[in-house]
A protein has these predicted regions:
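Bacterial N-terminal signal peptides that target proteins for export
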Residues: 1-10
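Histidine-/acidic-rich catalytic cores in large beta-rich domains
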Residues: 23-340
Length: 340
């Protein structure tokens, strides 16, 4: 077994993953998913394209999500709605496309008084979480859990009126939703002027507000997500996750304008850490990786960077077009096993 060590000025640190010991500052091995235009791309750690999925109509909003069966969930803008949710880019249509390119599910969800914004979250039970805004720009809107039915149908099985729970003082629109299967809780981040992170109880229909953080943000919040040892959108445990380095249970978000990725501990109600980084004015994403590194996208840029816990860039990919978000999936994730 090959052992690597790195001497830091605060001592000797090493990270145990599986049966080998690797540097915490090494890139986390896996596949990175992002989209440009109508196409989603999967790249390996050597920056080679492994696979791609293409939608036939509409435009992909924010990011696609790779599911355990190798299919991809897309939030799409195919038109048909009457207004933009709180001024955000709308989606309104959700598609699942298989590894081989077959459309497995194509469902449109909007109404006269609500339109989904650009994010969606896959769930372990096969459902999806959708954030939708009202025509009135100052109110955040609602969360909907939708159960897919057939090839073109869906049923709302849970909802949370975020505007009602947070009150009239919180203004802005929801632009990110993230589910924590271990806690059965939903995280949202709300755009300016509120600049708020909020957590809601998903375990029952009351959907009570559990946590709210609105301290010290002056930028535009995007891509808020849980730090979890589960693969994104699943309840499948990541086998090589280092819970201590990851700081499981914290939440992280991009704060454009502040030029930071901000991490908060909802248990202690404290800001844990911030990564200084050059962000754009729009969108972006941040993901804590199983080795403690952090994957960051500057929204509407062509750059994906992986930073170690000292803020050093250890892996970078320049894409061929502008992207909104990107997510890394480990080598042992079911969605990529035996697919390439």
């Amino acid at each position: 077994m090959k052992t690597k060590y790195k001497l830091l000025n605060v001592g000797l640190f090493f990270l145990s993953i599986s049966q080998s010991i690797v540097l915490a500052s090494d890139p986390y091995p896996g596949y990175t998913l992002f989209s440009i235009g109508r196409t989603a791309y999967l790249y390996d750690i050597d920056k080679k394209k492994v696979h791609q999925w293409k939608v036939s109509e509409g435009s992909i909003q924010t990011s696609p999500y790779l599911l355990p069966d190798g299919s991809v969930l897309f939030p799409l803008n195919k038109g048909g709605f009457t207004f933009r949710p709180g001024g955000a880019h709308p989606s309104g249509t959700f598609q699942k496309i298989s590894w081989d390119g077959e459309v497995l599910w194509d469902f449109s969800f909007f109404g006269d008084n609500f339109t989904p914004s650009y994010d969606v979250e896959p769930m372990p039970n096969g459902n999806i979480l959708v954030c939708a805004g009202f025509e009135e720009r100052r109110r955040p809107g609602k969360l909907f859990e939708i159960k897919p039915i057939g090839k073109n149908g869906g049923e709302v099985v849970w909802e949370c009126n975020v505007s009602e729970k947070l009150g009239d003082l919180v203004q802005g629109y929801i632009n990110s939703v993230s589910f924590n299967p271990s806690l059965d809780q939903v995280l949202v981040n709300i755009q300016a002027p509120a600049r708020t992170l909020a957590i809601f109880d998903h375990s029952n229909s009351k959907a009570n507000l559990i946590f709210k953080w609105d301290k010290g943000f002056t930028g535009r919040l995007h891509g808020g997500c849980w730090v979890t040892d589960r693969y994104l959108g699943t309840n499948i445990q990541i086998p090589d996750a280092d819970k201590k380095l990851m700081r499981i249970g914290n939440i992280i978000t991009v704060s454009n304008g502040d030029n930071q990725a901000v991490e908060v501990n909802p248990k202690t109600n404290e800001r844990v850490e911030s990564f200084n980084y050059e962000f754009s004015e729009h969108q972006g994403s941040v993901q804590r990786l199983p080795n403690g590194n952090t994957l960051i996208v500057s929204g509407y840029s062509q750059q994906i960077n992986e930073l170690d816990n000292n803020g050093k860039i250890v892996w970078s990919l320049e894409t061929s077009g502008r992207i909104s978000r990107a997510y890394r999936y480990g080598l042992k994730y079911q969605g990529v096993l035996n697919k390439n």
